[in-house]
From Swiss-Prot:
GO cellular component terms, semicolon-separated: cytoplasm
Protein name: 4-hydroxy-tetrahydrodipicolinate synthase
InterPro entries: Aldolase_TIM, DapA, DapA-like, Schiff_base-form_aldolases_AS, Schiff_base-form_aldolases_CS
Residues annotated as site: Part of a proton relay during catalysis: S46, Y109
Residues that bind pyruvate: T47, I205
Assigned keywords, A-Z: Amino-acid biosynthesis, Cytoplasm, Diaminopimelate biosynthesis, Lyase, Lysine biosynthesis, Schiff base
Length: 291
């Protein structure tokens, strides 16, 4: 269900110091992405500034996303928290709204032990909705080890992992240890998309696809159709963008990039702040090469 290129979408805010959502802008962005052939969308993730959204705003963003894509592509809704009860509340809401699955980041800051992680993810998966785990140690301070992921993959509702550890050996081991399950490993790093797919992964949850959806979809399609040379060529064509979108904390650069492309973005919510002039100039220069 969750394979291909799935943009982790931004949450546009109004120009009122980001106090309110721009849902019309969100839906316009989604129409653009779907028209470019993306295979799914991921609202309310890190790129969507989920940490600064209220519960009510989570509901509105997911509801607007589901309405906008109108069944054309699956919606994998961010529903994670370092509070298990809150993650359950987010997940139950996403399920009731009609999301196709939920993306659950590993609990951050409180650093649970192994048994706590198993109980946390299992309690969410027991709500009977497809769950994709999200491993991003650079943000959470904790790594989901391959053997832990393999154990979790045996839960019938845990269907995949967004792997953003940056460790290709770990990705390989996860794929190896989950081959006997209906379980998909998805890259959480645009620059690792092809290496992960070459090992048997299913695609990417992408930041860059907000900016260059056609090229990202083209790279995925070239690989799946056996045109390895074209896939590699597109990877290197996109590599400067991959780097530029992380010249500052995500989603600061990507919100600036889509704004420069004429898509809905709006301001960031504190504690995130706008890209400075020097980095904006560098990003603009990279974007100009894709015009």
């Amino acid at each position: 269900m969750f394979e291909g290129v799935l943009p982790a979408i931004v949450t546009p805010f109004q120009n009122d110091h980001a106090k309110s959502l721009d849902l019309l802008g969100l839906q316009s962005n989604l129409a653009f992405l779907v028209s470019k052939g993306v295979h799914g969308v991921v609202p309310c993730g890190s790129t969507g500034e989920s940490a600064t959204l209220s519960f009510e705003e989570h509901v509105k963003v997911i509801e607007a996303t589901i309405e906008a894509v109108a069944g054309k592509v699956p919606v994998l809704a961010g529903a994670g928290s370092n509070n298990t009860d809150e993650a359950i509340r987010f997940t139950r809401s996403a399920k009731d709204l009609g999301a196709d699955g939920v993306l659950i980041i590993s609990p951050y800051y409180n650093r649970p032990n192994r048994s706590g992680l198993i109980k946390h993810f299992s309690a969410i998966a027991d709500l009977d909705i497809p769950v994709v785990l999200y491993n991003v140690p650079s943000r959470t301070g904790q790594n989901l080890s391959p053997d832990l992921v393999a154990e979790l993959s045996r839960h019938p509702n845990i269907v995949g992992i967004k792997e953003a550890s940056g460790n290709i050996s770990q990705v390989s081991q996860i794929i190896e240890e989950t081959m006997d399950q209906d379980f998909t490993v998805i890259s959480g790093d645009d620059g690792m998309t092809l290496p992960v797919m070459a090992l048997g992964g299913g695609g990417v949850i992408s930041v860059a696809a907000n900016v260059e959806p056609e090229r990202m979809v083209g790279m995925y399609r070239a690989y799946t159709e056996g045109d390895w040379d074209d896939a590699i060529s597109l990877h290197y064509e996109l590599a400067p963008l991959f780097r530029a979108l992380f010249i500052d904390s995500n989603p600061i650069p990507v919100k600036k990039a889509i704004n420069l492309r004429g898509l809905a973005s709006g301001p960031l919510r504190l504690p995130l702040d706008e890209l400075d002039a020097e980095k904006t100039a560098a990003l603009t220069e990279v974007l100009s090469t894709y015009d």
